[in-house]
Amino acid sequence: MSIQGTILVVDDEVRSQEALRRVLREDFEVLCVGNATDAEKLLEGEIVHAILCDQRMPHESGVSFLKRVRELWPDPVRMIISGYSESEDIIAGLNEAGIYQYITKPWQPDQLVETVKEAVQLYRLQKETETAGVDVKATSGHIKKVVSVKRGVAKQLYDFDRIVHSTESPMHAVIELGRRAADYDISVLITGESGTGKELLARAIHYGSARANRAFVVENCGALPDELLESELFGCKKGAFTGAYQDRIGLFEVADGGTIFLDEIGETSPAFQVKLLRVLQESEIRPLGAQRVRKVDVRVVAATNRDLEAEVEAGRFRRDLYYRLAAFPVHMPALRERPMDIPLIAEGVLSAVKSSFNRPNLRFARSALEEFGKYHWPGNVRELQNEIQRMAVLADRDELAAPPLLGRRNGKRSAPLPAHGRLNGSASLKDKVEDLEKSVIMNCLERNDGNISRVASELGLSRVGLRNKLSRYDLRKNAKGDAFS
């Protein structure tokens, strides 16, 4: 095992510390503290390459702490990890504290490890360029070589042939569509439920295309308010809005010559959709606060778990933008629609778990694979990955038996939807639809014991979208977790 760097985790919850340590310890030395005071004491005597800090702590916010770290110990790369998405906190974090990455809960282990690896790499590149006496933005031959090698690895990692599926799987047709899309410089819209692998397909399309040697950039459009989303994508000038303390290059410029993946595009507002449409039509962006436009050459791959055609008919999504994005539509099947792939995917996940948990003898009992086949997997492949990791953590033996929690979920049937008088009465269509939507959400909350992540996944909503609906229907008291704390 090769340790790539030292990571400082600052989180007041011991369970969160342990979860991060477990995921990162394979590649990094992980130091955990529960508050800012202990973190500062540690920074005085340790060389730390990157800091992962929770936003909400008892006596001080993560942003406030990292702002001070930036002044006193500017070298470590700073990252915020949180389940909260207040716009002012995010804006302040990205600008005042010089945050490299804002990571939202629930985070995915593989993505988190890659993000931290990139942060450590950035630390080393900064130190190298300081030693050479040049600005970190200057592209040296060494940096070009690092980037070239990294993209070569990515091309192998995200090849279409590495997408797990059997010959009888509906994924076979999806992959063929993806290969065709890769051959042409055309916008692609990937639809499907949360956790089906939309980003994986988007990466395969990029790395199978003529743009493979340029950047592939990801933005989750459902996680940020309009102003910050525009700043992220189009860039901004210093002073363009509250918290814009420096010029910022947008992701469209970062992706120039490459591909940008716009996840959860269906969560965007009509006002933002107008601005995105212009970018697609004119191939140019205007950073917030700037007077001049800038030309960009970027391929757009968008994804959504919503029925965008229905959203268009309802007036919530612009028709002209939909047709721009859906020049080449591809639908990802749910995991329950490809049961023949479940054993293959499960074995692939288990192989990764063996390595990351250093338990090479782990194996599935036959009963576990049978249980996997019975379950409907509302969270799709992502839920299957999480379930296998959980099984490995809880297992005292090398054989992973049928998980009892999964068995209880299998036996848990949906209660009948409550009968509302307005559904059968003379109420307006809007009122009837709202009543039905509230009933569905209540039913799902009950079935999942109020777990926000599972409910959002099952309903095909982002956590932000679900929180809004819980507030609208006064269902916040039915939810558990950190959604409203």
UniProtKB/Swiss-Prot annotation:
One record GO biological process: phosphorelay signal transduction system
Q: Where are the 4-aspartylphosphate residues found in this chain?
A: 54
Q: Which InterPro entries does the record cross-reference, listed alphabetically?
A: AAA+_ATPase (IPR003593), CheY-like_superfamily (IPR011006), Homeodomain-like_sf (IPR009057), HTH_Fis (IPR002197), P-loop_NTPase (IPR027417), Sig_transdc_resp-reg_receiver (IPR001789), Sigma_54_int (IPR002078), Sigma_54_int_dom_ATP-bd_1 (IPR025662)
Chain residue ranges for the region called Disordered: 404-426
Gene3D superfamilies from the UniProt entry: 1.10.8.60, 3.40.50.2300, Homeodomain-like, P-loop containing nucleotide triphosphate hydrolases
- Keyword Transcription in the entry? The reply is yes
Q: Which GO terms describe its molecular function?
A: ATP binding; ATP hydrolysis activity; cis-regulatory region sequence-specific DNA binding; DNA-binding transcription activator activity
List keywords of the entry alphabetically. Activator, ATP-binding, Cytoplasm, DNA-binding, Nucleotide-binding, Phosphoprotein, Transcription, Transcription regulation, Two-component regulatory system
Identify the residues that bind ATP.
192-199, 264-273
Places the protein is found: Cytoplasm
The reply to whether Nucleotide-binding figures as a keyword in the UniProt entry is yes
Instruction: Identify the DNA-binding region of this protein by residue numbers.
Output: 451-470
Source organism superkingdom:
Bacteria
**Sigma-54 factor interaction domain ranges (all copies):** 166-392
- One GO CC annotation: protein-DNA complex
Residue ranges of domain Response regulatory in the record: 6-120
**What does the UniProt function comment say about this protein?**
Probable member of the two-component regulatory system involved in the regulation of the hydrogenase activity. HoxA is probably phosphorylated by a sensory component (which could be HoxX) and then acts in conjunction with sigma-54 as a transcriptional activator.
Identify this protein by name.
Hydrogenase transcriptional regulatory protein HoxA
- Give the species: Bradyrhizobium diazoefficiens (strain JCM 10833 / BCRC 13528 / IAM 13628 / NBRC 14792 / USDA 110)
Q: Which gene is annotated as encoding this protein in its UniProt record?
A: hoxA
